[in-house]
């Protein structure tokens, strides 16, 4: 059986996931966002939201994989590198975390320059 979601249903899952995250329920947010991304793995906003939820839920390994996926699809998005750094900190890999954070700062400075 092949299940698909309408754009409206996808937005409903995304917004409810974000709402759960804002209310401090990162685990619930992950459940909703996992459902969205199971059916539409390319949903970038869903992936970004899930990354934040994973970080808030201290799931460093999953967060690191999510951040790496986002970086592979949008390497110039500074926030992806910041999240990767935080995930690597959670995993205890401080050298990699420093490198990712440095990359974040470089992109941030580049994006803010006139």
UniProtKB/Swiss-Prot annotation:
Keyword terms, alphabetized: Chaperone, Cytoplasm, Plasmid
InterPro entries, A to Z: T3SS_YscY, TPR-like_helical_dom_sf
Compartment(s): Cytoplasm
Organism: Yersinia enterocolitica
Record's GO cellular component terms: cytoplasm
Gene that encodes the chain: yscY
Protein name, UniProt field: Chaperone protein YscY
Function, as annotated: Required for Yop secretion. Functions probably as a chaperone which stabilizes YscX within the cell, before its secretion.
Keyword Chaperone: yes
